[in-house]
A protein has these predicted regions:
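Iron-sulfur cluster-binding cysteine motifs and their immediate structural context
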Residues: 341-359, 370-383
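Glycine-rich beta-to-alpha transition loops that act as phosphate-gripper elements at the mouths
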Residues: 22-24, 106-110, 175-181, 246-258
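Glycine/Thr-rich beta-alpha phosphate-binding loop at enzyme active sites
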Residues: 73-74, 139-154, 185-242, 246, ...
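Glycine-rich, positively charged N-terminal anion/phosphate-binding segment
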Residues: 2-7, 27-101
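C-terminal helical cap(s) of enzyme catalytic domains, especially alpha/beta-barrels
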Residues: 52-70, 208-222, 276-301
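Glycine-rich phosphate-binding active-site loops on the catalytic face of alpha/beta enzymes
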Residues: 44-49, 135-140, 196-206, 253-254, ...
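Active-site beta->alpha loop and helix N-cap motifs at the rims of alpha/beta catalytic domains
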Residues: 67-150
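Catalytic cores of alpha/beta
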Residues: 29-33, 115-122, 179-192, 242-243, ...
Length: 383
């Protein structure tokens, strides 16, 4: 049987799955339930002072986007923990600790670095925190916190520097995807002393408009999460993993063991999940871990060290890929159902039908691969 244990920033986890800072961990009992389901680590909703600018709406703050009835993502107007710092310190962290998972505590980067340092000291003095995760990345906060700090390498550096100086346990920082170049921000965090980075928080977004009423589904800007954001997260993850030597916790779009493996193959040390639990409950944690264990055994891997970062070397610039020999669509006639989807979607007009059989013309095929992705029978390949 594979050993699912991993080490992140010097702390050992029983498996690489972590409950991200979000609604399922809004209190100590939620974190304890996640731990009871088998998760390796838990992160509470971001802890900070109870201020007016930290309050979130209670009149509907989640809007789910669907494609053909299937949820693909959601916009949320969640901010930070609605429990006060004192409630977490006096009661909730102790409840969460009873679950037995690693306690990776999310704290808010305050408007001034010295305020952040004070919060760091308050949380770690409880003795319940194993690591700290500094939130400089919430996509819809007041103008002095969240991504307004994390979009700036200079402000991120100052916050991490102050927090790390006050910390006696591993200190990490959660980055924002709402930037052009995350590498610059991650490098600044490393230079300031961060032990690790989380990639990443949600994407600033808008829910949309009900065209029957002309009113937005939700009136405020929110954070987009779920499966639809995974390609964006993978882009940031790979760029940082290839350019900054720092442990990474990946989060965004994890709905099963497959994404856990993908993120680790792209350089992540561990992987956080939120939406899967929000959509399916804490039992989803157990399913993902069991599936992960079965996959590792099936592949013959003994530990995640064997696969961590193995996909990074395959990434290449487009100009290099353009020099590779072209490939052309080939239709397996024994599998093809003659549905015609490939022909309808081929804008190079390379696919045609004759006597009930579909053919691909190499002279017209441009090797885009759309037909291979859209064929419901998996009858088309590029070769």
């Amino acid at each position: 049987m594979a050993n699912l244990e991993i080490t992140y920033c010097g702390v050992k986890y029983r498996n690489p799955l972590i409950l991200a800072s979000a609604t399922p961990g809004w209190d100590g009992e939620g974190l304890r339930l996640a731990a009871a389901a088998g998760i390796g680590g838990v992160i509470p909703k971001t802890i900070g002072p109870k201020q007016d600018w930290a309050a979130h709406p209670r009149n509907g703050r989640i809007f789910m986007h669907r494609y053909k009835g299937r949820p693909i993502g959601q916009v949320n107007l969640e901010l930070f923990s609605t429990m006060s710092r004192d409630e977490w310190i006096s009661k909730e962290l102790e409840i969460a600790k009873k679950g037995g998972a690693v306690m990776h505590i999310s704290i808010l980067a305050m408007p001034e670095p010295d305020e952040t340092a004070a919060l760091v000291r308050q949380i770690q003095e409880t003795g319940f925190a194993d690591l700290l995760e500094l939130n400089v990345s919430c996509p819809m906060p007041a103008s002095t916190v969240g991504m307004h700090i994390g979009k700036s390498a200079e402000r991120t550096y100052k916050q991490v520097k102050a927090g790390k100086a006050a910390a006696s346990i591993p200190f990490t920082v959660k980055l924002t995807p709402n930037v052009t170049d995350m590498v610059e921000i991650a490098q600044a965090a490393k230079e300031a002393g961060a032990d690790g980075v989380t990639i990443s928080n949600s994407i600033r977004s808008f829910s949309g408009v009900d065209i029957e009423t002309g009113k937005p589904y939700m009136r405020g800007y929110g954070g987009y999460t779920g499966p639809a954001i995974k390609p964006v997260i993978m882009r940031h993850l790979t760029e940082v993993a290839r350019n900054v030597d720092i442990p990474i916790s990946a989060v965004g779009g994890v709905t099963g063991f497959h994404e856990v493996v993908e993120y680790i193959m792209l350089g992540a040390s561990n992987v956080q999940t939120c939406t899967a639990v929000m959509w399916n409950g804490y039992g989803e944690i157990t399913r993902i871990i069991n599936d992960l264990n079965n996959w590792m055994d099936k592949k013959g891997y003994k530990s995640f060290d064997e696969i961590r970062g193995i996909a990074l070397k395959e990434i290449a610039p487009i100009e290099e890929l353009a020099l590779l020999p072209p490939k052309f669509a080939k239709i397996d006639k024994s599998v093809c159902t003659n549905c015609g989807i490939c022909e309808k979607l081929c804008f190079y007009r390379a696919i045609s039908e004759k006597n009930g059989i579909r053919f691909a013309d190499k002279g017209r095929c441009d090797g885009c691969g759309v037909c291979t992705q859209m064929c419901p029978a998996n009858a088309v390949v590029l070769e």
